[in-house]
Amino acid sequence: MAAAAPVAADDDERRRRPGAALEDSRPQEGANGEAELGELSRLRAELAGALAEMETMKAVAEVSESTKAEAVAAVQRQCQEEVASLQAILKDSISSYEAQITALKQERQQQQQDCEEKERELGRLKQLLSRAHPLDSLEKQMEKAHEDSEKLREIVLPMEKEIEELKAKLLRAEELIQEIQRRPQHVPSLHGSTELLPLSRDPSPPLEPLEELSGDGGPAAEAFAHNCDDSASISSFSLGGGVGSSSSLPRSRQGLSPEQEETASLVSTGTLVPEGIYLPPPGYQLVPDTQWEQLQMEGRQLQKDLESVSRERDELQEGLRRSNEDCAKQMQVLLAQVQNAEQLLRTLQGTVSQAQERVQLQMAELVTTHKCLHHEVKRLNEENQGLRAEQLPSSAPQGPQQEQGEEESLPSSVPELQQLLCRTRQEARAQLQAQEHGAERLRIEIVTLREALEEETAARASLEGQLRVQREETEVLEASLCSLRTEMERVQQEQSKPQLPDLLSEQRAKVLRLQAELETSEQVQRDFVRLSQALQVRLERIRQAETLEQVHSIMDEAPLTDVRDIKDT
């Protein structure tokens, strides 16, 4: 019995030892479960933080998209305002050109009036020149009269000498007459020397008493008759000399009527010697000295007028030549400026085309980055959904396991407990690795999104810089247009109407080219806005998609590589 008692005690002791071991292992398992639960809660907290960070990244992406849309809208508004301002400037320039055209038309009318006045002045000058031809004829007449007067002097000088000789003979005859009168046999009709003048006019009656004297008186009577003949010839020559000299004719005709003057002139002309009568040539006439002096004064005045008119004509011709030279120089300068402006416009067009190409390339890059972002968002959504799907099954078996753990008893053996611990550790390690992998992926996505955001900001800055450059180019173009406008105003004032349509057509062509460039820039901006709107619509559709099939169908649609795709869709 004593031996049996120790054996039983040993058996009881052996039975008690596994129970004690089980009782000792239960606190360890509880501690391990609590640690695993803490690790799971920590992992859940990290997952919640990662999800919250992903939501914040989505919010940041939405904010960036909204800011991008606002920036695009602001750029569009600014471009529209600039286009409106350019259109207003073009309208103002067109109205100013029309006003300049009307002013040039008025100036042309004024120039036509001035030309008509100048033509009238030239007609008057031609009339004066035509009046100058009679002046030449008067000068010729004066020269002819001078020559005739010289010839008359050549004729009159010997006649004057002969008259002097005849006067001497007349004095001798008067002395002889006085001697005869002193004699008692004198003739009663010869009492005065004043009767010699009627003898000179009618010499035949007085010759009868002279014949009587020649018959009765001898040599004295013959001498007296000879002297009477000489006196008759002298009286006739004296009358002829009175008619020939312009100074003695007015004195002898004072106090006579016009008929008596005409009769006296005819008588004196009849008594002239034929060689002494001056007959003017045909087409010429004799004029008095006063009229001759008046004609000379008029000729000198006309000569002065002719000289002044010729000087004015020379000055006008010189001014016209200078104005033509100035106009030619100004035209050359204007052509050079127009060529420079065209070259500047071509360079500006090249820069604008290059800027448009750069903008198109940047738009293509933005489209590609947008597609990449769409793919990344799609992948993130898929991973998020996968993580959620993994989390739900992992959380779902925990409840039954806890209930089963509560309901069922702990493992009865140490190997089972060790296997359970290894299994739980492996599960916890796998969950930790999955969470770390997800967190790493989220970090990578955050970095990529930040890089994409930085690229978008850089693209926006480059677009703003290009817009600033285009503004500067438009300002330079406006300045060149203003300078061209001023030059055109200055040149249009100096040119005639036939050159105005060409310049106007050139300016209109330039305006049309500028309008076409503005329309192309507006079209590019509208296409950019449409493309961004279409991309935003697709992104919103991807966000609102509930299944992966819808996302795949949206992403499998035609890529937005051209604006025509937007118009077709």
Curated annotation (Swiss-Prot):
Region (Disordered): 1-38, 181-267, 388-414
Keywords attached to this entry: Acetylation, Cell projection, Cilium biogenesis/degradation, Coiled coil, Cytoplasm, Cytoskeleton, Endocytosis, Endosome, Phosphoprotein, Protein transport, Transport
Record keyword Zinc-finger present: no
Gene it is expressed from: RABEP2
The organism of origin for this protein: Pongo abelii (Sumatran orangutan)
Compartments, record wording: Cytoplasm; Early endosome; Cytoplasm, Cytoskeleton, Microtubule organizing center, Centrosome; Cytoplasm, Cytoskeleton, Cilium basal body
Record's protein name: Rab GTPase-binding effector protein 2
Coiled coil: 34-184, 292-391, 423-523
InterPro entries named among the record's database cross-references: Rabaptin, Rabaptin_coiled-coil, Rabaptin_Rab5-bd_dom
Modified residues (N-acetylalanine): 2
GO cellular component: cell projection; centrosome; early endosome
Residue ranges, compositional bias (Low complexity): 29-38, 245-257, 393-403
Alphabetized Gene3D superfamilies for the sequence: 1.20.5.340, Single helix bin (1.20.5.730)
Assembly with partners or alone: Heterodimer with RABGEF1. The dimer binds RAB5A that has been activated by GTP-binding. Interacts with SDCCAG8; this interaction is important for ciliogenesis regulation. Interacts with RAB4; this interaction may mediate VEGFR2 cell surface expression.
Any GO BP: endocytosis
Gene Ontology MF terms in the entry: growth factor activity; GTPase activator activity
Residues with Phosphoserine modification: 189, 193, 200, 204
Reported function: Plays a role in membrane trafficking and in homotypic early endosome fusion. Participates in arteriogenesis by regulating vascular endothelial growth factor receptor 2/VEGFR2 cell surface expression and endosomal trafficking. By interacting with SDCCAG8, localizes to centrosomes and plays a critical role in ciliogenesis.
Family of the protein in this entry: Belongs to the rabaptin family.
Keyword Nucleotide-binding among record annotations: no
